[in-house]
Amino acid sequence: PVYRGKGARLQRALINFFLDEARKSGYEEIMPPTVVNEASGYGTGQLPDKEGQMYHCNLDDFYLIPTAEVPVTNIYRDVILDEKDLPVKNCAYTQCFRREAGSYGKDVRGLNRLHEFSKVELVRIDKPEHSEQSHQEMLAHVEGLLQKLELPYRILRLCGGDMSFTSSICYDFEVYSEAQKRWLEVSSVSNFDTYQANRLKCRYRHTEDKKTELCHTLNGSALALPRIVAAIMENNQTPEGIRMPKCLVPYCGFEMLDDKPC
């Protein structure tokens, strides 16, 4: 999509709001590349399983990232972290690229599924015994964003058949689309246990006995922008225009999304 005027400012406001909220929760911001090598995609599990959904630059054998999870998690490839430095908490805003091969029909038009979209991602690395607590904290963070945006939402715990094989547990957050009369996913928050860490050889060293152990990795969208923009527009319509959530007004500089000049 092309955003113009107040629409462009709304997009930028959401990005800054999501990053600021992540920083307040202790996440360090990363600005990663959007082009990665095959080893990076393999390390986080996108390759070879999802190769058909990724854009491949054949000439140089690089891939466009489907999510910031790929470059950010790969920062810790072949790294041994000190126990005292855990948990690692990173966030990143990037453009994401997905082929959406095999997706056809009215349900994938508009902002439902895009080949390129903006997203803020959370990545955490923690000790095995603390990863469930980290997962719960990430879930609470994403839920807090949706509450501040004043959007109708629901949380789904995915069954094994709906999860990626890389995840040990995953929750989806969905917002309601009034126009489509259905729920749309805006975030998935996953605990990968040792799956990615084993591929990446991401370990930590115990303080007492100096032995090393595989970390647990987690990630979640906080949040994906296109569907959030659509949800704000659908759920906040008034005769004067589209009302902005209070949390966004300081970021975008206006209370109503309308055709008046910025």
Language-model features: locations:
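TRNA-recognition modules of translation machinery and tRNA-sensing kinases, especially anticodon-binding
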Residues: P1-C262
